[in-house]
UniProtKB/Swiss-Prot annotation:
Gene name for this UniProt entry: NUT2
Region annotation (Disordered) ranges: 123-143
GO molecular-function term, one example from the UniProt record: transcription coregulator activity
Domain of life: Eukaryota
One GO term (biological process): regulation of transcription by RNA polymerase II
Assembly mode: Component of the Mediator complex.
Polar residues bias: start-end ranges: 124-143
Lineage of the species this protein comes from: Eukaryota, Fungi, Dikarya, Ascomycota, Saccharomycotina
Disulfide bonds: none
Family affiliation: Belongs to the Mediator complex subunit 10 family.
Main localization of the protein described in the UniProt heading: nucleus
Pfam families on file: Med10 (PF09748)
Signal peptide: none
Name recorded for this polypeptide: Mediator of RNA polymerase II transcription subunit 10
Amino acid sequence: MAEAARQELENQLRQTIETLVEISLLVHDTTGSQENKEGLIEQMDTLVKEFQRLKEIKCDKQIPIDVIDYIDQGRNPDVYTREFVELLLKQNQFIHGKMDIYTVSKGVRESTSDDIPLDISCGAHSNTEISTNPGQKRQGNVS
């Protein structure tokens, strides 16, 4: 049923666009004659009826306001879609990179957990013995 409503909406939109084109041609080529005025009034009535039919069509599709703004500015909505998809791809790559770094760092932490003690005390020690040779000891000041 949703497909039928979408098709009906598309057909009605096409008819409305055709009526708008006919109105623009009538306005552009107007001679000011009574016949021309009556034709324009008739097309305007048709346009109003087509807008009413558009309003009556039930369609559960929501159009983002950004897309409507694009159309109002005379831009192609496909450009909006392409730019939106490119932005999502960049964000996805960024998040994927963060996840990869976390996985690698977690692996490094796990592989070095035996080598590095968890409780490392830091501080200044005076007169700490520093060994330069395994058999020789000397006094040094580490700060």
